[in-house]
Amino acid sequence: MSSRRLGSSRARGRDLAHEVKHFGGLTKHLKKIIFDSNNCLTELKTSDHFEEEVISTLVLPPVADEIVGKVTKNPPALVIFGQTYTSKATLVNKIFREDLFQIVDDSDNNKTWRAVHLKYGSQRNTRLTLTNSFELLNEEPGSPVMRNSWTGIPRVEMLVKEEHQKDACMLSATTEATLNHPLLQCKLQILVTPHNCPGISISQAYNVCTHNVLPVLLYCFDKDQLSEENLRDLQELQNCAGTLPILFVDCREPSEPLVAHRERRLVEDAHEDFDDDSAYDTDERIEGERERHNGLDARLRRRCRPTPNDRPSVIDQLSRAGFISSPEENGRMRGVLDVFTIVNQVEDLHNSAAIVQFIRRSLQYYLIRCCTAMHDLHQHCMNLFITTAFDMQRDILVTPKRIEYARQRENELFDSLKDLTNQKQEQLRSLIQSTVADMTEDLLEQAGNYRFTDLEVSQEGKIQSQKDIKRCTEQIQDLVLARLNACVVEKLIGSVELLRESFLGTLQRCLASLEKIDGDLETSTTVALRQILNAAYQVEVSVRTSSSVVRIIWERMKEFFQSIKPFKTPTRVDTEWKRKVAQTMINNLDESKLAKSICSQFRSRLNNSHESFSTSLRQLEQKHSGRLEKTEEQRMKVRKVYAPRLARLALESTSLRDMVLYGMPKLEREIGRGQYGVVYSCRSWGGVTHCAVKSVVPPDDKHWNDLAMEFHYTRSIAEHDRIVAVIGSVIDHGYGGMGCSPAVLLLMERMQRDLHTAIKANMELPERLHVALDVAEGVRYLHSLGLVHRDIKLKNVLLDKHDRGKITDLGFCKPEAMMSGSIVGTPIHMAPELFSGKYDNSVDTYAFGILLWYVCAGHVKLPQAFEQCANKDHLWTSVKKGVRPERLRPQFDDASWNLMKSSWAGEPSERPLLGEVQSKLQDIYTKALAKREAEGGGGGGAKEQQNLKSDTL
């Protein structure tokens, strides 16, 4: 009997140990992902490719960062709370299948027990430690604390004596026990919370026992009811645990001891087949044995299921208090909840499989949270790279056009203003004349009321010296000139207001955008541009702020009055004298000469401003040229270095998450083989039945990067009826043994065949055209996302069971901004501009035209023009020279042939948009259906056409 129990103990220990060991292996992969991610992000932050506010977002959120730190740094631990000391001791003894905790009777529950920390050690040993990890050395030599030879942990080492119960240090001390046990050897730790310790609350015990570990919470009970104190403790525990689930373990003895004894014998017999050599067998064998044992456990549970009135109190109490769902719902939910919805549950102590399952799911919960957080960070970085690449490409394309636009608009403004000054001189003279006539009386009145400054004038208005008379005259002149200047210039501004509004607004916005791009460098060029605009074109501001334009008018008008001879010294400088001086000045104005002078000065100033503007714009263009070269270098580095590295990390993080959630897919028969991988069938994975698994073994970093980028673009595309959906991915690190590259398994929805096979199987023309319409719709969807497929061909179009087409193999698919001009694709489908390295999404239109040729031809033979080419180079040369597939009669009607020719036009600008292609192809498809119906080929044409219209809508 003892040998049977020992064998059963090892089997259960290995089962839980296997889960913990598996968790450790997955954690090791997670640590590598985090390490590589930190290195990559550190390099990004020091690269000066992104602004500070963008760099600040490349971090994990605080909550996610905390959980990632816990999972990667702390070992997993079972933290056992309980209703009584005996229930906790029973659970620990059940886990280890030996009496580590000695139980005398129920009186043990009234005693004070300190916390116990079980972890791995080469020898069995115990010691007392404080929270700060210092060992208590004040025990007597030879005391039980120093013993290292025991079967069960001595009670005296866990029991707090009465004389020590008022000693806070002794109460808070922890009994640390080391065991050489397979379960603890996997770095699992077990912590048992203190019992009946005065002054130590549940929250304090929780904080101490969960410190520096990754907790899995268990609460055991062995009484028929929970006391009010138990319920308060549970509520406090729930508040401390937050979102962490709690497993309630029923440690009560079975109601039928004899039946329980027979059931234990049956379980022991079932587990006895294990021996020491099979402790870490293959996953398949372990999983098979586990399923067999779970089946046995299920049968046993059915046999010992209690009656409805048999001890339901505790579960009802837990349900009413909200700690668990109702007993019926708890039974239905058990075993079917996914990891994201793991909840509190109740299990029987003897249902070890369910307990192990809860522990496994709790550990998975930690891993999934970490993997999800890391994957979200990787996705954020990838989206940032793509957005940045688009911004950089736009900057490279738009900046030269902005500079050219600014130059063109400035020239137009210069020519318009120059013509204005040449044509408006007579109007300007009339403007000055009318202005003077309108304001003469007002000027005379203001002159008569003027009070001289800095002059000594007697009360009678007498002036004694000729010098003072001259100064009085000058002040009257200044007054009249100032008023005259303001009115003349105000009307002068109105004559060029239309030009100012027509040219300056757009020109200023264009220059402002150029200066904003160069805003970090406050150079003389930027300042000069602003000064030129203010001085040359913003006439209103310059005049009103006493700029040089005002000074020009001021000085010229002063010259006209210099010839006025001073009056004889009057006896009185009164109002009449002031008005007379002002009237004399107005009478001596020469409007023609003044208008000519103003126009001449304005032309001179305009020419100088134009030359200065052109020089400054050339300097700005040179600066932007250097900056754009640096921008192109940054774009290439983002595309070639940072994006592939982060895409690979994103692939690894999501693959690890899928591995934790759904496990390794079981590969069945081979259903396809391509250049880069093999495709297998898979019965079910991740809740999806009938999957296809594409197994790829990247031989080097370049292939790894290409695969990662393909997966990123495929996975980031929203679900669409015309794109083959990717379900998930798993990385098999054990593929090929040590030192070999791991295999990447991409799981996709299972399709029936490809278009190449369908055409060989003599698919009818209307159905082939229907598939071509599906392809056009799928490519249009990719283009709407800014993606270019670059490899549209027959074998990359898969058909479902209804012969509807879906595009697959996005290995060459990229956003336009992320393309480097590399030559990719299938030679016969490659547009001529692909060989130059400068192309856009119209290459997909070209490839679609070639695909349409095969669709209408009804066979998969090479076009005769291409069949004569000896090799790829010969084929590419012919394509660049304009060689295209020939027209087949009578297969091609005029509409289909013209659509093909326009699609594969040599100039990308001459190719139609895919929306236009789809519209014309719809007409061709409708005619094909009508023709088949007219020939008696079937009555389903109208129905198919109606279905297609519905799909299109």
Swiss-Prot record:
- Give Gene Ontology CC terms: anchoring junction; apical plasma membrane; basolateral plasma membrane; cytoplasm
What residues sit in the active site? 791 (proton acceptor)
Name any one GO molecular function. ATP binding
Q: Report the residue ranges that make up the Protein kinase domain in this protein.
A: 665-926
Q: Which domain of life is it from?
A: Eukaryota
Q: Name one Pfam family in it.
A: Pkinase
Give the matching InterPro entries. Dual_SerThr-Tyr_Kinase, Kinase-like_dom_sf, Prot_kinase_dom, Protein_kinase_ATP_BS, Ser/Thr_kinase_AS
Location of this chain's protein in the cell: Cytoplasm; Cell membrane; Apical cell membrane; Basolateral cell membrane
Disulphide bridges, residue numbers: none
Q: What is this protein called?
A: Dual serine/threonine and tyrosine protein kinase
Q: Which reaction does it catalyse?
A: L-seryl-[protein] + ATP = O-phospho-L-seryl-[protein] + ADP + H(+); L-threonyl-[protein] + ATP = O-phospho-L-threonyl-[protein] + ADP + H(+); L-tyrosyl-[protein] + ATP = O-phospho-L-tyrosyl-[protein] + ADP + H(+)
| Entry's Gene Ontology BP terms | cellular response to fibroblast growth factor stimulus; embryonic organ development; negative regulation of apoptotic process; positive regulation of ERK1 and ERK2 cascade; positive regulation of fibroblast growth factor receptor signaling pathway
